Design a protein with these regions (language model features):
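A late C-terminal transmembrane helix in Major Facilitator Superfamily
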Residues: 338-377
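Central cavity-lining transmembrane alpha-helices of secondary-active solute carriers
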Residues: 48-63, 261-276
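Helix-breaking motifs and short loop linkers at transmembrane-helix boundaries and internal kinks
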Residues: 38, 70, 91-96, 108, ...
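Structural signature of the two symmetry-related core transmembrane helices
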Residues: 73-88, 288-303, 385
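Helix-loop-helix hairpin linking two adjacent transmembrane segments in secondary transporters
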Residues: 134-190
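Conserved MFS/SLC helix-loop-helix module at the cytosolic interface between two early adjacent transmembrane helices
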Residues: 57-95
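Extracytoplasmic gate region of multi-pass secondary transporters
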Residues: 26-27, 213-275
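Cytoplasmic helix-loop-helix junction between adjacent transmembrane helices
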Residues: 101-140
Length: 407
């Protein structure tokens, strides 16, 4: 990587770590909220799904803004809004107001991915490698956030813990503000097509172009992956807490939940998956790689309820495999966008992608809650396995198309 690549990597690593620090800490709070607000998993899952949906709904305008005005300001604004959103969560006195706070958090979080990822695909020379480091940082956030939350929730009230989580965003903003880089490569157009026409009409025209090519398949793959991701992680802490091998342990008068640390460890293993997926995107066909990842996810998902009954070591192993492969997919489909979409509309394409991943994909939280409520863990993982199965079909079509000779 050259100097500009390294600075873009550092900047987006900060933003990505901040995003996932908050995003996957919320499921740990879900365990507490089930009791604090006296609601069922189905109801709370739907409330959380609404908040997560805003990440997707706001992604489309964020992508268009990134094409027109650049990414740096949007990423910094996103980090500030996410920190502020957790302050609002901390003071929410009822379930409806908690839902409002989650919506506001989701709106701020929606700014990150289209802005940050289009910065990488447009501004860096070694896109796959930068995406790999970007993904690793995201998984560090996903692991550190839940781990710190688990420790703090052991000793402190959940409202105080939520308020303290505003501090990481403030620190990230201070560091990010000191990084300077060139957002677009010299080979990109000086002006994006988003600035050549009136805003809405330009977006409509660009969207028509996007959805007549292979991007439609890439978009559908991302939607299925996002639904799987949200369905899995919203209630995974609750699923792990119900396993006999992770029964609570009392140490020095304090009760510790081993399942929370297993959850954090699973997310940390995901960093290796992100890095592997990103590096393979530079050296191998991303179409072939994503096919292999979906096959692995199907096998691991269907095996999970069975393998976790075989004891501690088997449970830890299947959790590690789950974490590795679910996160390996993300940098690969991001690289596919860089491959199939023109540079001047990549912000818009990432906007649509994360509208699908976090907007439509937010339904995964509700699906998971319903499956757990009415069918338990076995039904949950059967339902989840259907999603990478659909992704496998679409990815295979994309692979076949990519191998056809150009006319």
């Amino acid at each position: 990587m050259d100097r500009n690549d390294r600075r873009i990597a550092r900047f987006t690593m900060l933003g990505h770590a901040t995003f996932h620090l908050y995003e996957l800490t919320i499921p740990l709070f879900v365990v507490v909220w089930l009791e604090a607000f006296d609601v069922s998993a189905a109801v709370l899952g739907t409330v959380v799904a609404v908040g997560y949906a805003l990440i997707g709904i706001g992604a489309l305008p964020s992508g268009a803004l990134a094409d027109s005005y650049g990414s740096k300001r949007l990423v910094v604004l996103s980090m500030a809004g996410m920190g502020g959103g957790f302050v609002l969560i901390a003071v929410a006195p009822s379930l409806p107001l908690l839902a409002v706070a989650l919506v506001l958090w989701g709106a701020a979080a929606s700014l990150y991915h289209p802005a940050g990822l289009s910065l990488i695909t447009r501004g860096s020379e070694r896109q796959g490698t930068v995406l790999a480091y970007h993904g690793v940082a995201g998984n560090v956030g996903t692991a550190v956030g839940p781990l710190v939350a688990a420790l703090l929730l052991t000793f402190l009230d959940w409202r105080l813990v939520a308020g303290l989580f505003a501090v990481p965003a403030a620190l990230a903003i201070l560091v990010a503000g000191r990084l300077e880089f060139v957002e677009r490569t010299a080979t990109d157009p000086d002006e994006s097509t988003a600035t050549d026409a009136d805003g809405l009409s330009a977006i409509v025209a660009q969207s028509r172009v996007l959805f007549v090519g292979s991007f439609l398949l890439v978009f559908a793959i991302a939607v299925l992956a996002g639904t799987y991701y949200r369905g899995l992680f919203t209630f995974l802490p609750d699923v792990l807490a119900g396993l006999p091998v992770f029964e609570p342990v009392e140490i020095a008068g304090e009760t510790f939940e081993p399942s929370q640390y297993a959850y954090a460890g699973l997310l940390l293993v995901g960093a290796a998956g992100q890095y592997t997926g990103g590096r393979l995107s530079d050296s191998r066909s991303p179409e072939r790689t994503i096919v292999a990842v979906f096959i692995a996810l199907i096998v691991v998902s269907l095996s999970f309820p069975v393998v976790t009954s075989f004891g501690l070591f088997a449970t830890v192993a299947i959790c590690a495999l789950l974490g590795f492969f679910v996160f390996m997919e993300a940098p690969i489909h991001q690289a596919l966008i860089g491959e199939y979409v023109a540079a001047d509309v990549q912000g818009l394409s990432f906007g649509y992608t994360y509208l699908g991943v976090f907007g439509i994909g937010a339904a995964g939280a509700s699906i998971a809650g319903i499956a757990l409520t009415y069918g338990g863990t076995a039904l949950l993982f059967v339902a989840l396995a259907a999603l990478p199965t659909g992704g496998l079909v679409l990815a295979t079509i994309l692979l076949v198309r990519s191998r056809r000779p150009s006319p």
